[in-house]
Swiss-Prot record:
Residues 784-794 have a biased composition (Low complexity). Homooligomer. Interacts with RUVBL1. Interacts with RUVBL2. Interacts with GTF3C1. Interacts with ABT1. Interacts with ribosomes. It is an enzyme of class 3 (hydrolase). This is DNA-binding protein SMUBP-2. It comes from Mus musculus. Belongs to the DNA2/NAM7 helicase family. Its EC number is 3.6.4.12, 3.6.4.13. The R3H domain recognizes phosphorylated 5'-ends of single-stranded nucleic acids which promotes binding of nucleic acids and stimulates ATPase activity. It comes from the Eukaryota.
């Protein structure tokens, strides 16, 4: 062993750990000194206003207390937080700063948190159900001390079973050639070829083997098989992982195989299903359990006698007896522990739980033959050295393409602390020590292909059983547009759904994306997908809180977490909200590629990504994700979900050719495969953009595509000139004929209908979309002289603004475009089409008549009877552009109220809800028709900030009954004290007289 190599490695690791420790301590100190309790809660390290919901005695006399948020509604959930099972927490009274007790968090759900307190707290801890408490995550000194001790042991390690392994792991020597092993008889007969090869490889290696398991490839199944085969060969196995959850997962799997297993660790940190395998539980069932209990009872009795006697000689005798009893107790307990450890085939613990200051110190140094470290890529390298020093061979399993070890210090992470042992060894030794699992059993082919190409060099494939499965294949789920696509991109670019810019907060939120998530989940649930099969993943705690406020009451089974909370998990459908939407193009820690990989690969059948492509495309990796979804999935704009959004490029300025924001290069329309083509397998979408995968090269199960627009002139955004020319030729034939109406089939996609709308406007024809869902179709007809839906081409000179027609009524949407000029109907046309569809539906409901063409005719007749005031321009052709500009300027400087023509140049206000200007007498939202939107906005703001503003209503001052009763008791107690003081003073006066 090269001592210089070991010393330099240990020195570097100790320095990095010191940086991490200092950063953690400084962070905690800064939080407590400069952050309010509410800010601590927003950071996820504190839970406020908790009430005791239940108390019970847990395993081995521990006191388990369950806390819940104070209930002000039917269903209250905990705010988004970073608490996990096993964390050390401090308990505080809400009205005091002193710490009441320290406990271990055993379980946390969306509605409650359970903490285990030791027996020592039973006498001092008196929790009142009517009081409120808070929990604060505390720094764990034990872990840091154990990591430091392991590195110092490595530095002093000269001879022992792990000497050769240490040289290989630190690069002083190379791994030995693999051994020849006989053919294996596998316990699990369903293993695929790559899994069997990985098992054989791990057993044949003499010192080091690495099992690389991408998402869904059955890594844990392979690790369990390796452990079983090692036990079959008579080897003693120490199995570790960085987290309690990962260890318990292995315990559950091994317990099914009827092997003798022993789980080390605090019982409060273990899952209830594995607690009977813990060391404490095994000791309680051992032969020495009764003897140990008798010795403890004798010690208690001698203590009692010692307190009662006053004789010094007797006290001395009692102390000597207690000393002897304690010595016997220690010997008996150690003998029982050694017996339990040696009787086990597999000993399991966390990396730090395998330290030498625990039960393993009772075993010989060379007791274990092999160490298995699962989820090694998530562990700090220093923590892996705790178990690695106990055996001559190690098997590492994990995926260094997923989440790295969690660190606080950015400086330490950049210096190498976030680089795992597995990642370092895989890069150094390559295929000589690594075997990759290549068949995944989780994801649809389209989902898998992106992860395979982006992160794993295209090396793993889908098993046929999952390659084509979709949500619609689940029992009770109907075939809808949402359940038949594996990939869905909902693009918010140009829709004005910007992220929240919270001051003094590092967290981000996006209420617009929350609304989109809510609508998409409702569509999935309506189709029959169970809420428990859906996961919503957000990168920021603030967004998680907003999502829970919107969804948890209606869908309590729905899981809403950050990316870190879903590592190793899977769901049938996953919705990703990227949150970031800003004009600077900042993506924050979305730039961490491995986090995105984890988020996408949690899904089995359906992934929906909600993002602003204009923002996220500033990061190369995210751009590849958007491009892949665009090419192989379905792309929709946010306007297909939200009717009341005014896009950023849909402004008065934009109509003058001076858009306030650059035109997004993301797709703005949804391109879907019609139902008839879905059944026949025919493709109706446009050809892909140059440089992308062609339709024939698409993976199985991939869906239709939409292309980015590289032009800004509103041309066809999906390529597809053949389809456009086909529609143009059809309309030209109709114009040349004597027919009055042309109907297009229902098989047209929404984007095809958009093309027809554009062409109809260009030819000056009337165009209406009627019907719902698959029955929706578009009808093109000739304009009647009285029709004023949009301006037809006019050979004569354009009319002046003074001669323009009166503005149509607000409830009669009118598409105003420039004839024979480049039209930009993208999002605006789609929005107007949706409005027309809604009004048509309302007219059918009111009159009980089919929509068809009756609505435009009645609108025209109604307009003849009563023409409201308000100038509107008939847009001229490009020959007289000055008239167009003057008309638009005049309209922009006139009150937008339907019966008002007062100028707003001097006295006017802009409405944030409808993006129009109004005179002062009409600017209130309740007057011009935005009352509901204003109230909704106020409610949302109050809910988010927790502050009542002037005009937002009166605060409910009614006290909670429990709180009122508590205050009443305090008042009665105080009055009693004052009354007794008055009585005593009165008696003193009487005595004085």
């Amino acid at each position: 062993m090269a001592s210089s190599t070991v010393e330099s490695f240990v020195a570097q690791q100790l320095q990095l750990l010191e940086l991490e420790r200092d950063a953690e301590v400084e962070e905690r100190r800064s939080w407590q000194e400069h952050s309010s309790l509410r800010e601590l809660q927003s950071r996820g390290v504190c839970l406020l206003k908790l009430q005791v919901s239940s108390q019970r005695t847990g395993l081995y006399g521990q006191r388990l207390v369950t806390f819940e948020p104070r209930k002000f509604g039917p269903a209250v959930v905990l705010p988004s937080n970073s608490f996990t099972s096993g964390d050390i927490v401090g308990l505080y009274d809400t009205n005091e700063n002193s710490q009441l007790a320290t406990g271990v968090l055993t379980r946390i759900t969306q509605k409650s948190v359970t903490v285990a307190f030791d027996e020592s707290h039973d006498l001092q801890l008196n929790l009142d159900r009517e009081n409120t408490y808070r929990l604060l995550k505390l720094a764990n000194d034990v872990t840091y001390k154990r990591l430091k001790k392991a590195l110092m042991t490595l530095k002093k390690y000269h001879s022992g079973p792990a000497s050769s392994l240490i040289d290989i792991l630190l690069g002083s020597s190379t791994p030995s050639p693999a051994m020849e092993i006989p053919p294996l008889s596998f316990y699990n007969t369903t293993l695929d070829l790559s899994q069997k090869e990985a098992v054989s490889f791990a057993l044949a290696q003499k010192e080091l083997a690495i099992i690389h398991g991408p998402p869904g490839t059955g890594k844990t199944t392979t690790v369990v098989e390796i452990i079983l085969q090692a036990v079959k060969q008579g080897l003693k196995v120490l199995c570790c992982a960085p987290s309690n959850i990962a260890v318990d997962n292995l315990v559950e799997r091994l317990a099914l195989c009827k092997k003798r297993i022993l789980r080390l660790g605090h019982p409060a940190r273990l899952l209830e299903s594995v607690q009977h395998h813990s060391l404490d539980a095994v000791l309680a069932r051992s032969d020495n359990a009764q003897i140990v209990a008798d010795i403890r009872r004798d010690i208690d009795q001698v203590f009692g006698k010692n307190k009662k006697t006053q004789d010094k000689r007797e006290k001395g005798n009692f102390r000597s007896e207690i000393k002897l009893l304690r010595k016997e107790l220690k010997e008996r307990e150690e003998a029982a522990i050694v017996q339990s450890l040696t009787a086990a085939d597999v000993v399991l613990a966390t990396n730090t739980g395998a330290s030498s200051d625990g039960p393993l110190k009772l075993l010989p140094e060379d007791y274990f033959d092999v160490v298995v470290v699962d989820e090694c890529a998530q562990a700090l390298e220093a923590s892996c050295w705790i178990p690695l020093l106990k055996a001559p061979k190690c098997i590492l399993a994990g995926d260094h393409r997923q989440l790295p070890p969690t660190t606080v210090s950015h400086r330490a992470a950049l210096a190498g602390l976030s680089r795992s042992l597995m990642e370092r060894l895989a890069e150094k030794h390559g295929a000589g020590v690594v075997r990759m699992l290549t068949v995944q059993y989780r994801m649809h082919q389209a989902i898998m292909c992106w992860a395979s190409e982006a992160m794993y060099h295209g090396q793993f494939t889908s098993h046929p059983s999952v390659a084509g499965h979709l949500l619609k294949d689940l029992p009770g789920v109907t075939d809808t547009e949402e359940t038949r696509v594996p990939l869905l991109l909902i693009d918010t670019a140009g829709c004005g759904l910007l992220e929240l810019e919270e001051e003094d907060s590092q967290s981000k939120g996006n209420p617009g994306e929350v609304r989109l998530v809510t609508l998409h989940i409702q569509a999935l649930v309506d189709a029959g997908v169970q809420a428990g099969d859906i996961a919503v993943i957000a990168p920021y705690n603030l967004q998680v809180d907003l999502l829970r406020q919107s969804l948890s009451n209606k869908h309590p089974e729905l899981e809403i977490k950050s990316v870190d909370g879903f590592q190793g998990r899977e769901k049938e459908a996953v919705l990703l909200t990227f949150v970031r939407s800003n004009r600077k193009g900042e993506v924050g820690f979305l730039a961490e590629d491995r986090r995105i990989n984890v988020a996408v690969t949690r899904a089995r059948r359906h992934v929906a990504v909600i993002c602003d492509s204009h923002t996220v495309n500033n990061h190369a990796f995210l751009e590849t994700l958007v491009d892949y979804f665009t090419e192989h999935g379905e792309v929709r704009t946010a306007f297909e979900y939200l009717d009341d959004i005014v896009p950023e490029n849909y402004t008065h300025e934009g109509s003058q050719g001076h858009s306030r924001v650059p035109k997004p290069k993301c797709p703005s329309t949804s391109i879907r495969k019609p139902a008839s083509d879905q059944e026949s397998g025919q493709e109706t979408r446009a050809a892909p953009r140059h440089g992308r995968r062609k339709p024939s090269e698409k993976p199985p199960g991939s869906h239709v595509q939409s292309q980015h627009s590289s032009s800004a002139n509103g041309s066809d955004r999906t390529g597809g000139p053949d389809r456009t020319e086909h529609f143009r030729a059809t309309i030209e034939e109709f114009v040349a004929s004597k027919e009055s109406q042309l109907e297009f089939p229902t098989s047209l996609s929404s984007h095809d209908r958009l093309r027809v709308h554009q062409l109809a406007e260009e030819f000056g024809l009337r165009h209406d979309s009627t019907g719902e869902g698959k029955a929706r179709h578009i009808t093109v007809s000739r304009r009647s002289p009285a029709s004023s839906g949009s301006v037809a081409p006019q050979p004569s000179s354009p009319p002046s603004p003074a001669q323009a027609e009166p503005e149509p009524r607000a409830e009669e949407p009118v598409t105003v475009v420039q004839a024979h000029c480049p039209v930009q109907l993208d999002l605006k046309a789609l929005h107007l089409e949706r409005l027309q569809r809604q009004q048509s539906s309302q007219a059918q409901t009111a009159k009980g008549q089919p929509g068809g063409d009756s609505r435009p005719q009645k609108a025209s007749q109604k307009k003849k009877k009563k023409e409201p005031k308000g100038p509107v321009m008939a847009l001229p052709c490009e020959e007289d552009f000055d008239a167009l500009v003057s008309a638009v300027v005049k309209a922009d400087n006139t009150c937008s109220f339907s019966k008002c023509s007062v100028s707003t140049t001097t006295l006017g206000q802009f409405c944030m809800h409808c993006s129009h200007r109004y005179y002062l007498s009409h600017h209130l939202p309740e007057i011009h028709g935005c009352g509901e939107k204003a109230r909704a906005h106020a409610r949302q703001r109050i809910s988010r900030e927790g502050v009542l503003y002037a005009g937002s209503g009166t605060k409910d001052r009614a006290l909670d009954p429990a709180k009122r009763a508590q205050l009443q008791r305090r008042l009665d107690k105080k009055l009693g004290e004052l009354s007794s003081q008055r009585t005593s003073r009165k008696k003193e006066k009487e005595r004085g007289t």
